[in-house]
Regions:
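Short flexible/disordered coil segments
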Residues: 25-30, 49-67, 175-186, 227-235
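A generic structural motif
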Residues: 16-18, 81, 219-222
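Surface-exposed cleft-lining segments at the edges of enzyme active sites
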Residues: 87-92
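Short amphipathic alpha-helices and their capping/turn segments at secondary-structure boundaries
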Residues: 39-45, 103-110
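Aromatic/acidic polysaccharide-binding cleft in carbohydrate-active enzymes
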Residues: 3-6, 53-85, 104-144
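Active-site-proximal helices and loops of the catalytic beta/alpha 8
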Residues: 1-54, 125-154, 163, 184-187, ...
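Alpha-helix-centered segments that form part of catalytic cores
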Residues: 94-102
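Carbohydrate-interacting/catalytic domains
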Residues: 96-97, 109-116, 124-235
Length: 235
């Protein structure tokens, strides 16, 4: 209600954030919920909007603590933050680092402005305020924290250099319980983003709009794929 002509240009999109947290942290929440929330925001604010898509916030428990199961979605995260130090220094389940990178990758590749809450770039733990305001750490990082830091830096560097991610159309390619794929496209420059919540590898055949593309696709991380100008096969 505060975003519009003569008002604010943008604010935190908590509707998308809350659904993103549930989707990436919980195995029982499918990507349909997140895609619906994102499409609803596009309806209200437009695809090329100035809304901020956040990794965390001082009014929420840390995502990684939800993802690791160190704090429950059913409990009051603010009370938890006052009564105990959630997760101590690192999450109890280190697969939560991978889930956090998925959340950050989502924010970095959708329209809008990606925003990192301090500490999320290394996966700091914590409940709600004041437990999510711990002192920032810059040294003695674990292997999981180093991985999150390196991939976050790569994602943000890519975001800053990609016209498709900054200005491109948003086209969903696959929206399922465990798999989410979409295309960002800007005048022949395309970026395909794929998320997989399955515990094992999956092979996807994605139909892409036929057009002349500038150059070939390259994997940002270690993903494997093949491509023939209209179909992208991702392993």
């Amino acid at each position: 209600s505060y975003v519009g002509s003569g008002q604010m240009d943008g604010q935190f999109d908590f509707n998308v954030y809350d659904d993103a947290v549930a989707t990436f942290a919980r195995p029982d929440v499918g990507f349909q919920r997140l895609n619906n929330s994102l499409e609803e925001s596009f309806h209200y604010y437009g695809v090329h909007n100035m809304m901020s898509y956040i990794s965390g916030n001082q009014d929420r428990a840390r995502f990684i603590s939800y993802a690791a199961g160190d704090i429950s979605f059913e409990e009051d995260s603010k009370i938890a933050g006052w009564k105990r130090k959630v997760g101590e220094r690192k999450p109890s389940d280190e697969t939560a680092y991978d889930k956090l990178i998925q959340l950050i990758a989502f924010n970095a590749t959708i329209p809008g402005i990606p925003v990192l809450y301090y500490g999320d770039e290394i996966g700091m733990t914590g409940g709600n305020d004041p437990d999510n305001r711990r002192m920032m750490r810059f040294q003695d990082l674990s292997e999981g924290e180093k991985m999150v830091k390196e991939k976050t830096a790569a994602l943000m560097k890519f975001r800053k250099s990609s016209m498709a991610l900054m200005y491109g159309d948003f086209i969903p390619l696959r929206v399922e319980n465990k798999v989410y794929a979409y295309l960002r496209s800007y005048f022949g420059q395309d970026v395909v983003v794929v998320f997989n919540k399955e515990p094992e590898e999956v092979t996807l055949k994605l139909d892409l709009p036929q057009r002349d593309r500038k150059g070939q696709f390259k994997a940002l991380f270690e993903g494997r794929f093949s491509y023939d100008n209209s179909k992208l096969i991702v392993d």
